[in-house]
Amino acid sequence: MNNHFKCIGIVGHPRHPTALTTHEMLYRWLCAKGYEVIVEQQIAHELQLKNVKTGTLAEIGQLADLAVVVGGDGNMLGAARTLARYDIKVIGINRGNLGFLTDLDPDNAQQQLADVLEGHYIIEKRFLLEAQVCQQDCQKRISTAINEVVLHPGKVAHMIEFEVYIDEIFAFSQRSDGLIISTPTGSTAYSLSAGGPILTPSLDAITLVPMFPHTLSARPLVINSSSTIRLRFSHRRNDLEISCDSQIALPIQEGEDVLIRRCDYHLNLIHPKDYSYFNTLSTKLGWSKKLF
């Protein structure tokens, strides 16, 4: 065992059969190599592991040096929103579909992870967004997002009228089905499917991408990540929502605004030493190969 990581947490999809196989392999392999291992409680229950140290995501974030997330990007997003609050590094083994965030190959995970555990890795600091639904002199409802914060109707799709302020200065008004506010990490997710630009992970930028706008002049906008975005609504209604990473929904009540800003903390995402962001884009999006 080396000195780069001493305590490793295992988290991810607790009920997917192939993911559970990877969880079990990972647990036994890490224990055999002498690491202290903490297994997320639900995973330990599904695997029927005995005499194993278990913990919640928050406890793993507090105690472990590295968290290995087994699953797809959705599992990574769910875990990362909690783990980003702590001084812990995170890496993913892909048991999902695209795998933009979980980039270890499950068939070669042992060797790739062995190299990482020896200190052969690169680290990226991915920032999060914080969304607040608030009314003057009232308690705020707050959530965070790794990928994006989305304004949308709560149930049936319909047009929304709203104003966008950037650093408390009016920027534009819009009539559309919603708005996607994305980090660079999320620029290859929902934002991309709505026509937004791809941002490299190190950019300090946020994108605002309209969803089915009712005018051809509405275009994606890229702003500095230090800016604060305020959304105000022309017709007070009780059927609007803000969703974070398509996993957490915050309802917007009459008279409330939405504030979106960069989080004070970030996700320490690590990759194998040979990781290339542009190679990942080319592979996942089916870009053309080199000509010569």
UniProtKB/Swiss-Prot annotation:
Keywords: ATP-binding, Cytoplasm, Kinase, NAD, NADP, Nucleotide-binding, Transferase. Its main location: cytoplasm. Its cofactor is a divalent metal cation. The keyword Cytoplasm applies. InterPro entries: ATP-NAD_kinase_N (IPR017438), ATP-NAD_kinase_PpnK-typ_C (IPR017437), NAD/diacylglycerol_kinase_sf (IPR016064), NADK (IPR002504). GO terms for molecular function: ATP binding; metal ion binding; NAD binding; NAD+ kinase activity. It is found in: Cytoplasm. The active site is at D73 (proton acceptor). It comes from the Bacteria. Transmembrane segments: none annotated. This is NAD kinase. It comes from Escherichia coli O7:K1 (strain IAI39 / ExPEC). The lineage of its organism: Bacteria, Pseudomonadati, Pseudomonadota, Gammaproteobacteria, Enterobacterales. The gene is nadK.
